[in-house]
């Protein structure tokens, strides 16, 4: 339990941010999985799914959920795997 008001507030803010980041990260990972399964299945919509996954990865980096370099690496490897 926090000893100060400010510590309690920070704990509350941290928890809210953690949940927000978890949601963003989860949707990003789901999009990446959809691209990989579409690639393995050989469906035509893999490039559309790739574009949406790229967008979600870039948004996660912009929000600070993941580092910019991590986002670039994920996008690069995902694009390379389809090519």
Swiss-Prot record:
Any one GO cellular component localisation term in the record: small ribosomal subunit
Gene Ontology biological process terms in this record: translation
Keyword rRNA-binding part of the UniProt annotation: yes
GO MF, one example: structural constituent of ribosome
SUPFAM superfamilies, per database record: Ribosomal protein S20
Pfam families on file: Ribosomal_S20p
Presence of keyword RNA-binding: yes
InterPro entries in UniProt: Ribosomal_bS20, Ribosomal_bS20_sf
Region entry Disordered, spans: 1-44
Role: Binds directly to 16S ribosomal RNA.
HAMAP family documented for this protein: Ribosomal_bS20
Entry's family note: Belongs to the bacterial ribosomal protein bS20 family.
The protein's name: Small ribosomal subunit protein bS20
Organism the protein comes from: Desulforapulum autotrophicum (strain ATCC 43914 / DSM 3382 / VKM B-1955 / HRM2)
Lineage, highest ranks first: Bacteria, Pseudomonadati, Thermodesulfobacteriota, Desulfobacteria, Desulfobacterales
Gene this chain is encoded by: rpsT
């Amino acid at each position: 339990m926090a000893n100060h008001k400010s510590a309690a507030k920070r704990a509350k803010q941290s928890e809210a941010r953690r949940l927000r980041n978890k949601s963003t990260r989860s949707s990003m990972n789901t999009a990446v999985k959809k691209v990989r399964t579409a690639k393995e299945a050989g469906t035509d919509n893999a490039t559309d799914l790739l574009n949406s996954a790229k967008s979600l990865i870039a948004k996660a980096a912009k929000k600070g959920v993941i580092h910019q370099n991590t986002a670039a690496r994920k996008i690069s490897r995902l694009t390379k795997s389809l090519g």
